[in-house]
């Protein structure tokens, strides 16, 4: 609807330019917002106040001219002027009802992408291999997954890339320790303890550390024995990751892995190409690119180091190779990097070097989708009681058990297998939703009690809200798609619910544009609250007429489908009953 109003305003402005009321050459960004007070309409625009000065008119006088020039539209019942010159638009409820009927008949709920369909690379999760995933990997994994789901729903061609840390000095350390302590695959599956023991040996023995560094060189040179052991470590690590992804209900598979090692063969070429473009400067033996846009506190340009003095490559080199691959080989239109916002400087530098070096041959927007940290109750990074790193799988297991105990207490008569299933859906959903509902760039404190609460903006509340809608249809023995008739919007609670339902597409396009799933969370929470008010004030099963019952059932069906689809786009499973 906002796009429709923008188009109407644009047509009016074009008419006013033709009439000489407005000067030529104006290209204003027409803003249309939801009206705060429904008595003043459904949508508002400040365009008259924006253009009053170039028009040489008072805002209200210009607003009158704009309203007079607005084309008629079946979607708008009337437009009015408010305050200093706001334009307020009232939706036509019959047109709104028709849109919702069409949405209910559509597999995509009437949602379409606002712009052209694109090929989008999502760089997400990216754990370091050779040890298990920890809680620090949660945000990149689930935020990236949710945005990828939304983009796919809108029609984009999404390529997920799990840029795992599968190369580097830690593997030399592990290989050296494995040489000293040959063990079985079963023993090796306990990666955390094996890594800890190898790290202890590395820190305590200079001879061991020297041998480990030598094995890194052999590994990088393609030594068959080293490569075989490295592959063994990598496969075990990835199997650990895959179990976590499956428990999280995240759409990442082995086929999506494109780790650091995948770019090894191109690293020397990256350095050579930077040199041929005249971008490299040697500094203390290292090969660097200096960019004037990025300076230290003394005002000196910061180096982007692509090759160390000993010939080794760095993260920047690998990331530059990845940019080139994603642009030139994958032909991506966008590349979204879901990486901790503390890496913002790194990515801004890499993106600028890539542009200057001509590595972005196919026009590709590069966007760092940074995020804040998940902290403990004390506001510090989340740790175990003894200060260790919390394994992600352990956190999720605890969430399942806590949710199971909570559900069993409320529903002791349910069968054990159903209790376990509900516990898993609620527990995993609670952890994910608590994260996704926060603004991506914000830090937040992890709190089981808050996230498992059945009140407030939580997964349990939304999951229960969905089962409440499903329960209406279960009583009737019908599905969401088995309701005849048409939507008729008469009561205020019907109109409020309908207006919010109609905004689903706008919300999803917002998430796709900015990479912010919390916007979808807020929408679903608001929608659930509006349905609750509608359900309490507009009887469905006890409606006054058959037509009224069908209309309200159709509103309920569209609410149920929207809640289910929205939760699925967040990566949350739903339940038919709790």
Curated annotation (Swiss-Prot):
Catalytic activity: tRNA(Arg) + L-arginine + ATP = L-arginyl-tRNA(Arg) + AMP + diphosphate
This protein's record includes keyword Glycoprotein: no
Taxonomic path: Bacteria, Pseudomonadati, Pseudomonadota, Gammaproteobacteria, Pseudomonadales
Main location as per UniProt: cytoplasm
E.C. number(s) listed in UniProt: 6.1.1.19
UniProt keyword tRNA processing present: no
SMART domains: Arg_tRNA_synt_N (SM01016), DALR_1 (SM00836)
HAMAP family tied to this protein: Arg_tRNA_synth (MF_00123)
Protein name: Arginine--tRNA ligase
Subunit: Monomer.
Keywords: Aminoacyl-tRNA synthetase, ATP-binding, Cytoplasm, Ligase, Nucleotide-binding, Protein biosynthesis
Subcellular location: Cytoplasm
InterPro entries in UniProt: aa-tRNA-synth_I_CS (IPR001412), Arg-tRNA-ligase (IPR001278), Arg-tRNA-synth_N (IPR005148), Arg-tRNA-synth_N_sf (IPR036695), ArgRS_core (IPR035684), DALR_anticod-bd (IPR008909), Rossmann-like_a/b/a_fold (IPR014729), tRNAsynth_Ia_anticodon-bd (IPR009080)
GO cellular component terms attached to this protein's record: cytoplasm
Pfam family, one: Arg_tRNA_synt_N
GO BP of this protein: arginyl-tRNA aminoacylation
Family designation: Belongs to the class-I aminoacyl-tRNA synthetase family.
Organism: Pseudomonas entomophila (strain L48)
Position of sequence motif 'HIGH' region: 127-137
Superkingdom of origin organism: Bacteria
């Amino acid at each position: 609807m906002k796009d429709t109003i923008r188009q109407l305003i644009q047509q009016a402005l074009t008419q006013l330019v033709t009439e000489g009321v407005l000067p030529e050459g104006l290209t204003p960004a027409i803003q249309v917002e939801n009206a705060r007070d429904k008595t003043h309409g459904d949508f508002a625009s400040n365009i008259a106040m924006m253009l009053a000065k170039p028009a040489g008119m008072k805002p209200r006088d210009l607003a009158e001219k704009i309203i007079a020039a607005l084309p008629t539209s079946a979607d708008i019942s009337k437009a009015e002027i408010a305050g200093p010159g706001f334009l307020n638009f009232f939706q036509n409820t019959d047109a709104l009802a028709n849109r919702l009927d069409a949405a209910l008949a559509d597999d995509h709920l009437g949602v379409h992408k606002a712009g052209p369909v694109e090929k989008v690379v999502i760089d997400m999760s990216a754990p370091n291999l050779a040890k298990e995933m920890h809680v620090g990997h949660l945000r990149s994994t689930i935020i990236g997954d949710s945005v990828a789901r939304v983009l796919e729903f809108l029609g984009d061609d999404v390529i997920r890339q799990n840029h795992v840390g599968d190369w580097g000095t830690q593997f030399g350390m592990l290989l050296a320790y494995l040489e000293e302590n040959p063990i079985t695959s079963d023993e090796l599956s306990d990666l955390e303890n094996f890594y800890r023991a190898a790290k202890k040996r590395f820190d305590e023995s200079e001879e061991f550390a020297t041998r480990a560094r030598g094995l890194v060189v052999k590994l990088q040179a393609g030594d068959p024995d080293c490569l075989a052991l490295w592959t063994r470590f990598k496969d075990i690590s990835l199997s650990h990751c895959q179990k976590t992804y499956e428990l999280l209900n995240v759409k990442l598979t082995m086929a999506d892995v494109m780790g650091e090692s995948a770019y090894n063969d191109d690293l020397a070429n990256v350095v050579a190409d930077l040199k041929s473009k005249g971008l490299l400067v040697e500094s203390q033996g290292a090969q660097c690119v200096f960019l004037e846009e990025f300076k230290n506190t003394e005002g000196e340009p910061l180096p982007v180091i692509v090759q160390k003095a000993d010939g080794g490559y760095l993260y920047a080199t690998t990331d530059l190779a990845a940019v080139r691959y994603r642009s030139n080989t994958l032909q991506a239109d966008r590349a979204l990097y879901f990486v901790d916002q503390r890496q913002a400087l790194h990515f801004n530098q890499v993106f600028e070097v890539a542009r200057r070096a001509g590595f972005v041959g196919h026009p590709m927007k590069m966007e760092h989708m940074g995020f804040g940290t998940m902290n403990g109750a004390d506001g510090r990074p989340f740790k175990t009681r003894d200060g260790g790193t919390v394994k992600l799988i352990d956190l999720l297991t605890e969430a399942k058990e806590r949710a199971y105990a909570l559900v069993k207490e409320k529903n002791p008569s349910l069968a054990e297998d159903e209790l376990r299933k509900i516990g898993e859906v609620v527990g995993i959903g609670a952890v994910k939703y608590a994260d996704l509902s926060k603004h991506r760039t914000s830090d937040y404190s992890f709190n089981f009690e808050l996230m498992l609460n059945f009140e407030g903006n939580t997964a349990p509340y939304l999951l229960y809200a969905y089962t409440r809608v499903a329960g209406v249809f279960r009583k009737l023995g019908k599905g969401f798609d088995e309701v005849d008739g048409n939507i008729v919007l008469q009561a205020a609670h019907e109109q409020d619910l309908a207006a919010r339902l109609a905004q689903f597409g706008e919300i999803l396009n917002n998430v796709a544009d900015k990479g912010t799933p919390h916007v979808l969370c807020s929408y679903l929470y608001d929608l659930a609250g509006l349905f609750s008010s509608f359900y309490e004030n507009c009887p469905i099963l006890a409606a006054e007429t058959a037509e009224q019952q069908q209309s309200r059932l159709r509103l309920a069906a569209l609410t149920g489908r929207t809640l289910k689809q929205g939760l699925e786009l967040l990566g949350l499973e739903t339940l038919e009953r709790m």
